[in-house]
Amino acid sequence: SPSLPEARTFLSDQSKKALRNKEYLRGLWPKQEASIFGYGLGWDSVDLHPFKEYGIQALVKGGDTNLYHGSLIVLPDHNLTFAALTSGGSSVLNLLMGQELLLSTLLANGTIDAIPPPYVLEASKRSQAPQEQRSYAGLYANTTMVVRIVIENNGKLIATCLTDEQTPPQEYYHTESGSFVDEAGKNHLTFVEDGQGKLYVHMVRIIEVPDLGTNVLTSYEFEKVTLPTPSVHAQEAWEARSGAWYYAVNEGPSSQSYHLMLSTRFLLSTNEELPGFVGTLRIIDEQTAFNEVQLPVLAGRDNALCRIVQKYGKEYLDIGGSLFISERDMEALDTRRYSILATPAGGYARWFITDSRHAGKTMQVVLPESGAFAVYDGQECIHYSTVDGNISVVLPQEGKVVFIGKAAGDLFTVILT
């Protein structure tokens, strides 16, 4: 509890003060007037808008897992704190909720005279793009996508995602202020050269949630990249793996990852328009790929070396220590009434495919101590014993089953009826 003497003396006054410093100003960071991010030591922001407009320091820490979302806002000089943990939404929604509640509290106790109006981006007339601006066209990347930016003479900018065909093209229009603005006027894009040969897309976005609140996110959204030129053998090696889903094998039996199909698998995909890339990763050699962009905040997070490794006679995809096995290397689940299987060397989870021979059959599993299993159809997890209990499950026709143990040699008895 914060009221306990131990809590009050856990950090020295000097350390508490250091935590509030604007550490983001010490490194690569976009120029910003306002944003929900501005790193301190451990804080996502140490000068959250709009509190800083009143000279009030607001410290923010948010976070998201697959199933839960949290946000903490502290006004240390006013003895006010907001915290929310939700099982839906996002940490940003929680932040907006806390922002509005704290502003209302400050208004009620007389600390501020009025709640500020929503942040507005300056409007400017559309204009043709000068040659200097048009020269910025090309390939740009962050850790989640690679886009091709085209800038037309009339000032229209089109950003097309090359790594996800489900993402629609984004359109912006050049303005007399020198920035590119989307149709709604909620997103402003500019190009920034760092003086050392790197070119960034600087983005200011209005975050607006009806009946909840408004804020702004300022970031370097992309870094300009060039097409890599790996060897023919390296390109062919990754193309041979393209189109295959890789599934997690070294998560624990209680991991959230197995509860959501999205978080338990990873797709390797090459693209004719992006030779030298596998997804957003630059191909280094036959076994290694890496995203070399360096961006602060969200656009550059979760960047890890991607390697193909051999373990215990099988090929795995290693992404920052998380191991995945290709669906092409999975066996079909045994169709006999009774079967026993064991976790392999390394204690990795074992994945199996279900087909027409399994469809409609009921599966019961006798689990080892602390073991778990999960069943998936083509779209989602339909049963995870850690969440749903160890009960019988009807198997889908085109699905997958994973058995998760704690150590090598853990035994699972499978009964099909």
Segments from the language model and where they lie:
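Catalytic loop of the DD-peptidase/beta-lactamase superfamily, centered on the K-T-G motif
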Residues: 1-417
